[in-house]
UniProtKB/Swiss-Prot annotation:
Gene3D superfamilies: Bactericidal permeability-increasing protein, domain 1 (3.15.10.10). Pfam families: HAM1_C, HAM1_N. It comes from Schizosaccharomyces pombe (strain 972 / ATCC 24843). The keyword NADP does not apply. Keywords: Lipoprotein, Palmitate. Residues 165-176, 196-223, 767-781 have a biased composition (Basic and acidic residues). Residues 165-223, 714-781 are annotated as: Disordered. PANTHER family: CHROMOSOME 19, WHOLE GENOME SHOTGUN SEQUENCE, PDZ DOMAIN-CONTAINING PROTEIN. Palmitoylated. The keyword Lipoprotein applies. InterPro entries: HAM1-like_C, HAM1-like_N. This is Putative cell signaling protein.
Amino acid sequence: MAVAYPTDKHVVHEETGKGLEVYSIWTAISNGKMPSNKQLRGLGSSLTDGAKSVAKERQKKISDPARKFFSDFSKLIDNSFNVFAKKNEGDLLQNAIYELSQAEGSTNVNEVWNDITEDMQSQDFSTEDLKQLFLLIFNNGKLRTLLQNAIVLLGQQTTNVASKKLNEQDGKKSDNLRNGVNKVKQNMRNGASARDQAREQGSKAKDKIKNDPDAQKAKEETKQKLQDLYEEFKSVAVDLQGDPKYQHPVRSLLNLIDKFIDKLSEQSGNVTADTNEHYDRAMQYLKQLVENILNRSLDNLIDTLKQVQHDAENDEELKDWLESTRQFVRKVLLKKGYAKSDASDKEFNKLRDKGDELLNGRYKKRWQQLSSEVKKISDSASSDKDVKQLFSNYKNIYGDLIKREGGQISLKTSMCLEILRLGVPVILEKMQYFPIPRLEIEQPDFDVVLENLNLQTANVLPKLAEFRNNNFVRFSPYANITSFRENMINVHLSNIQCDLKDVNYYIKRKQGFPTFTDLGVVDLLIGKQGMVVNLTLSSFSNTMFENELPDSFFKVEDVKVDIHHIKLKIRKSRHRLLLAFLKPSLMTYVRSTVARSMELSIRHAFEQVDREWYEIHKEAKSEIEKDSSKPTEDQESKLKVYGRVAYSRISNLHKSSKEKGKDSQVRVALHKENTALNNIVLPSGNLQRSEEKRRAALSGSTWHSPAFNIFGVDDSEDSDSPWATDRGSRLYQRTKGSVKSRESRLKKEKHKNRPASKGTYTTYTSSEERQRSTEDPLSHDTLSRTILNDQIVKGNVTEIPLPPLAVNEKRASVAVSSIPSFGDDQHDIELLNSTDPRKNRILYNQPPAVA
């Protein structure tokens, strides 16, 4: 056997369709499409089934900790999607994100202080801000602690702390008070003297509460907790100011709060807000989503805030205090250096004393009402059993993968390697083929276009990997002998195979002799030992004991690629005789060219990884050094810092690669819009199929897309699409049936599609075409046929008359974009791409099909 897994033409069409569906999903997401709750539930079922299948199929090779991980992972996925579907009932989050993306209005805030006027103008709360705020809450543990402490402190104000402390005193004081109350009740029957005695007893009780030391102690404790909360707030503000990517989301959130307050007051003060219907609908969706998460309506809280705003409109003192508090929060969060200044502490103390006077004075009842509502919401959210179970599952996964040693957090390396060893084969089994619809290579000497490249994942990956590590250390106590250390790693990868069938190619040699243009179909086989890669990496230091980081982690010393067995079979070509004569030298050229290009690609990839890895390490180490001055409990773990820095670096790299990819000499075109050499048309099926799925992925209304029907059909959208098959909600469920049954169906379809009579071309309605494509994935029509069928359904075209055929004359379909022959007819490429009817008539050697 030449390769480990030979290409099976009977299943390659179906398997490559899975890869094209992945491309279409990426296209849909890139264009703002999102899966619905039902579609996400199908994805969750697929992930759960995959995790269970790994544990089931590898029973003899799996350890108990790994089995526990896959079990916990299945439970986490199930509970996550169930909680999400329950809280997000009605696709609230998707609707909110879509409305935010469609909003044209902006939330503009006037100048609140002169230092940051320009920065506060035209801040839009967008979907990117929503994502960054979510990441901020997820990554910043101090912010989560701050929110929790604020809610707890606010909830403590629902009842009179001093009264609680008084009721918790010893039995003697309680009995005295109870006896006093009973005595008052008994004497109430005695008329005016009893009422006077009751007043006297009541005033004594009030004096006890007022002068009680426990009440004063509780008040001081509350004041101290508020001071601690402010210190935590300053610490969070300093962290946010040190990360530029959070500045815009924080400003946008503050503007959103200003806008909300402006709506409560029903009039504009110093803040003006511009809005539109999309923005208002987005806020309604988000409000409903928050209520579902908290398990309680926010209407009472909003009504209370409206009453507070109404009080502020009628009380200048309260209004000034609220406005000063808002401006103070802005300064601390946005003005660099202000949080650490003495001016901020003085202003905080001033605002705290004034607030204590107002909230514990004439607005005490309103403040208790607000605190009570916040506590009810907090209690309702914390008592959610589903969320508690979800956090329990998350802790189990965290414990399976993370270990704590010496106060530091690190990954369980052996566990992660075992998960990869067990999971990767299952993933490769599910995705056997990796399609590349079109590959374009532009060089000064030649242009090459390849289509219908269906790579087998099991063949492309090396079957054997070897690593060898060599260490060399030299040191001496004498100054004239330089200490030296070097580490060298040798990597050997072999049995990298490839079996490509029916590859459509176009090649044009622009310089040298001879210049020629050719196109055709070729089979490429790299088998047996296949491609062998030998890579040598080294890391060295000129000094034995150096503390500073080197410029890089490793250096690529040598890359050697050998291709031991390559076979090229040219099935169709415009220059068959010439290629047959030049085949020996051509094989040598192809082998050396492929090996050289692979060497350059591997070297470039490792050098880029080294640069990015070094920058990530350098930035993370700098942040860790800054955190070292903080208390131990406030320091972030190294794993978390590295993960956050790596995520930010990879995101920036992805954006820059998009811009550079447009001018790259080697391009992978997923659909027609990505092609640069669009004047070159090859008879490949993958590019047309990818284009169909791309158009269908963008065809859904608003944020819906039929591309996500691969997970599960969305009832809210028309499931009449290329994804509406009988596969159900499983991602990798395969079509049943043997090769014989598939071939017999193909023969029946071929007989069925014959023209009904001379001079006519039989077509089918769109529903019939979809039924045929569902019955067998191989019976695939191109984009031109789809467009033609749509016109027939609309009634624009009923029958296409064709002139009668001559004797022994063959007719070529005009509904299929294909080139009939490469070997018999030596046509020029310009003729193949021409839209001139006369040239097309020459090409097909027949009259035009449509007059």
